[in-house]
Curated annotation (Swiss-Prot):
Belongs to the AB hydrolase superfamily. MenH family. Monomer. NCBIfam families: menH_SHCHC, PRK11126.1. Its EC number is 4.2.99.20. This is 2-succinyl-6-hydroxy-2,4-cyclohexadiene-1-carboxylate synthase. Coiled coil: none annotated.
Length: 252
């Protein structure tokens, strides 16, 4: 089984850019950014429970990484960078910590490396369980209206919140709930030690208004590109800033 994706060709010999969206997003999320790199072949993936992969269920990160590996193989992708936001960043970090043939490097925007204390895991398990229950039983517009009131999205203004609520409400609540539970931070291992011992290039993107993830980036001993005038969803709030950072990373 493979994940659904959209592919765009680039110059032969250049590595692929493999884009992984955040929770409740889909393969369209990164396309505005990816279009600015026409020399690179680009693969925009729908993660399980999302977009055209909504019917794909997983039991945890191991399943997601297996599906990612199968998808890359099916497209004959032999050399690539992983670029992921939030949930997609966590999947990318998990995958990068495994042995992946052809892997060139990792770019993560606002992705959590993992919780360190059991009490934090327990609290996150309860929180994600409550959200999952709401996704299953309530209108998605109501759930996402509350979702985007969380502190991590404090930099969004009213119109930005409304646009995201309208967009995310097109999802399937049941499949979102299943993916939220399967890939909760409560079940993700703490990746700090493995990432700090990495042998591959790793870059972090963070909105300057995203204080939580700025602090997390500092724990990773990784080059961090601060995106001006942006919060947690930097590639949406300041796409030009993210394009500039990616261009620097890819040495364009």
């Amino acid at each position: 089984m493979i994940l659904r994706a959209q592919a765009n060709g680039g110059q032969p010999g250049s590595p692929w850019l493999v884009f992984l969206h955040g929770f409740s997003g889909d393969c369209r999320e990164w396309q505005q950014i990816g279009e600015q790199f026409p020399d690179f072949s680009r693969l925009y993936i729908d993660l399980p429970g999302h977009g055209d992969s909504a019917d794909i269920r997983v039991s945890g990160f191991a399943d997601v990484c297996d599906l990612l590996r199968n998808t890359l193989f099916s497209y004959n992708i032999l050399k690539y960078w992983l670029v992921g936001y939030s949930l997609g960043g966590r999947v990318a970090m998990m995958a990068a910590c495994q042995t992946l043939p052809g892997f060139c490097g990792l770019v993560v925007e606002g992705g959590h490396p993992g919780l360190q204390r059991e009490a934090e895991r327990d609290a996150r398990r309860r929180s994600d369980g409550r959200w999952a229950a709401r996704f299953r039983r309530e209108p998605l517009r109501d759930v996402f209206t509350d979702w985007y009131q969380q502190p991590v999205f404090a930099s969004l203004d009213a119109s930005q919140r409304e646009a995201l609520v309208a967009l995310r409400s097109q999802n399937n609540g049941e499949t979102l709930a299943a993916m939220l539970e399967a890939t909760s931070l409560a079940v993700q291992p703490d990746l700090r030690a493995r990432l700090n011992a990495r042998t591959f290039p790793f870059y972090y993107l963070c909105g300057e208004r995203d204080s939580k993830f700025r602090a997390l980036a500092a724990e990773l001993s990784v080059p961090c590109h601060m995106i001006r005038n942006a919060g947690h969803n930097a590639h949406r709030e300041n796409p030009a800033g993210v394009v500039d950072s990616l261009a620097q990373i890819l040495r364009l």
